[in-house]
Amino acid sequence: DATVMLTQVVGEFEERAKKNQLDIVVDSPEPPVKIMADGRHLWRVIDNLMSNICKYAMPGTRVYISLEKFNGMVIMTFRNISKSQLNISSEELMERFVRGDSSRNTEGSGLGLSIAQSLTGLMNGNFAIQIDGDLFKAILSFEEVF
């Protein structure tokens, strides 16, 4: 169940988010929301996105995470305001070893989004990133299983 998985992974980041002064707002339908996905892979994808949010989101802001069903698809969206403007394209940001923070003052290798994209593809899902100034949005979509 995608709702339960999302809730569990996000729950593991609550303390870290509070430490970084982030308010996480999750909007999801009542379970079950079923998709065909490998549990370990999906956990890793959500974990990578949440780790990036905790590292790169502007302190004192809200992070919006939504799960919705639309036309036979299940769509997970992660939105946050970045600490600094992202002067990079979404395609470049998903390349291996590329990081969005030019100052490189945070831990990490620049592999998280590339891994998330690869794992999502292995599960027959779609992974997309949208960047608009300092607004970062990651969108995962999978076919809903009935």
Provide a role label for each language-model segment.
Residues 1-14:
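A conserved beta-strand-to-alpha-helix junction within the catalytic ATP-binding
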Residues 18, 23-33:
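Conserved catalytic submotifs in the C-terminal HATPase_c
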Residues 53-54:
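Short helix-loop "hinge" at the ATP-lid/N-box region of the Bergerat-fold HATPase_c
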Residues 60-72:
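Short beta-strand/loop element within the Bergerat-fold HATPase_c
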Residues 85-98:
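Short conserved segment of the HATPase_c
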Residues 93, 112, 116:
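Short alpha-helical Gxxx[C/S/T] motif in the catalytic ATP-binding
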Residues 124-132:
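Glycine-rich ATP-binding loops of the HATPase_c
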